[in-house]
């Protein structure tokens, strides 16, 4: 049986929950498109997050690996296109580290593109009434750090998805968009399914002008 690694993060930045882990863990043990999903929690820490990710990649040898993170304030589900070789933290991670203008991997390539069918995923989400977009930047915090490290490692079809706040988080952030947990779970389930069943990605617009 094929396997899928789905990772989420612990809460960070003063939050008490993280939608990435709350959604990912709902799919742990589920079979999607003939593949078994294994959800794993990553620390929101530079270095340690990749250490744990690599342990899970070695243990599971997945066919697909999708890392998931929180992007509070985003108005949609963001399917990431690219990860860059830069750690530039606006505030410390959960271990108190705040790297500024440091490489994720010394002497590594400037960037990596996701190998997931990102446009097919976005199209599929929109068809189901879920707000989604192709994102051109995964930021420079631990999410980008993990996405870059995942793609640098190589192996499974891989990429990263950012989820917006959950409603209980948005209450503390007036005006912020939120998405129900059930919708977050449905989005990840579809992303896993399409990553397993779609070959070449769809050729359709998904760019931005800024």
Swiss-Prot record:
Residue ranges that the Swiss-Prot or TrEMBL entry lists as coiled coil: none
Entry annotated with the keyword DNA-binding: no
Active site residues according to the UniProt entry: 80, 143, 162
Enzyme class: hydrolase
A matching Pfam family: Peptidase_C15
InterPro entries hit by this protein: Peptidase_C15 (IPR000816), Peptidase_C15-like (IPR016125), Peptidase_C15-like_sf (IPR036440), PGP-I_bact-type (IPR029762), PGPEP1_Cys_AS (IPR033694)
Keyword Iron-sulfur attached: no
Single annotated GO MF: pyroglutamyl-peptidase activity
Main function: Removes 5-oxoproline from various penultimate amino acid residues except L-proline.
Official protein name in the record: Pyrrolidone-carboxylate peptidase
Organism annotation: Chromobacterium violaceum (strain ATCC 12472 / DSM 30191 / JCM 1249 / CCUG 213 / NBRC 12614 / NCIMB 9131 / NCTC 9757 / MK)
Gene behind the chain: pcp
